[in-house]
């Protein structure tokens, strides 16, 4: 299972590991937001972090790479793609975003949030709450996203941006889905399909000038 270190989490859930970017940097500047989902995020993120301490917990994982080339310059694609708000109306499951905390330590901008989703599960739709943290490195044009939701599904994402030198940009989403063996294929297939749909919607709206 591929994991990416969490540089900044809620203070009640521990501090960054020694040697991590946040541990070396100055104290981050943070803004806290009060909302109805904040305690839920904190409790769920504690479960997520506990799971990270036990990577051999019996769950299965599937890794996918989802590259897409967008006919627009790197800076344009980066600014649109790394903005969570542009997911709304384009990610097929996503119905809302609730931000709990934003931090900036000079190297990374960190956003703690809950994604409100309607997830299709056969004949029914499951109202999921995905607890997540996005870490953005603007200087090096990449970001990571860590998320956890019921029933004990973890997703690790590394999104990178490559200037192709011809006015186009290739974005690759390297995603690791982790779930119980009975759910892993469904989780990976559903997750990959939703990300492809989101990528294609972003590509279209960047190239046609909507974004």
Question: Which residue ranges define each predicted feature?
Answer:
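Hydrophobic ligand-binding cavity/cleft-lining segments
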Residues: 25-105
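C-terminal region of N-terminal signal peptides and the immediate post-cleavage residues
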Residues: 8-27
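A short, structured loop/turn motif at beta-sheet edges
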Residues: 71-75, 102-107, 135-141, 160-170
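Sec-dependent N-terminal signal peptides
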Residues: 1-9
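Glycine-rich portal/gate segments that line the openings of hydrophobic small-molecule binding cavities
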Residues: 55-57, 99-151, 205-209
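Beta-strand/loop substructures that line and gate deep hydrophobic ligand-binding cavities in soluble
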Residues: 146-196
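Intrinsic-disorder/low-complexity, polar/charged segments enriched in Ser/Thr/Lys/Arg/Asp/Glu/Gln
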Residues: 61-69, 110, 129, 156, ...
């Amino acid at each position: 299972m591929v994991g990416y270190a969490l540089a900044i989490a809620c203070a009640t859930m521990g501090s960054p590991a020694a040697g991590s970017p946040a541990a070396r940097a100055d104290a981050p500047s943070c803004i806290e937001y009060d909302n109805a989902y904040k305690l839920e995020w904190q409790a769920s993120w504690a479960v997520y972090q506990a799971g990270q301490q036990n990577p051999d917990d019996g769950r299965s994982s599937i890794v996918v790479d989802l590259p897409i080339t967008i006919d627009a310059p790197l800076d344009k694609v980066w600014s649109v793609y790394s903005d969570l708000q542009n997911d709304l109306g384009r990610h097929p499951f996503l119905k809302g975003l609730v931000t709990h905390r934003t931090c900036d330590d000079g190297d990374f901008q960190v956003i703690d949030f809950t994604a409100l989703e309607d997830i299709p599960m056969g004949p029914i739709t499951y109202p999921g709450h995905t607890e997540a943290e996005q870490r953005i490195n603007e200087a090096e044009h990449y970001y990571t996203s860590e998320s956890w939701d019921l029933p004990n599904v973890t997703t690790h994402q590394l999104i990178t941006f490559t200037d192709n030198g011809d006015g186009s940009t290739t974005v690759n989403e390297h995603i690791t889905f982790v779930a119980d063996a009975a759910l892993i294929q469904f989780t990976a297939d559903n997750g990959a399909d939703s990300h492809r749909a989101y990528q294609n919607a972003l590509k279209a709206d960047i190239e046609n000038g909507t974004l």
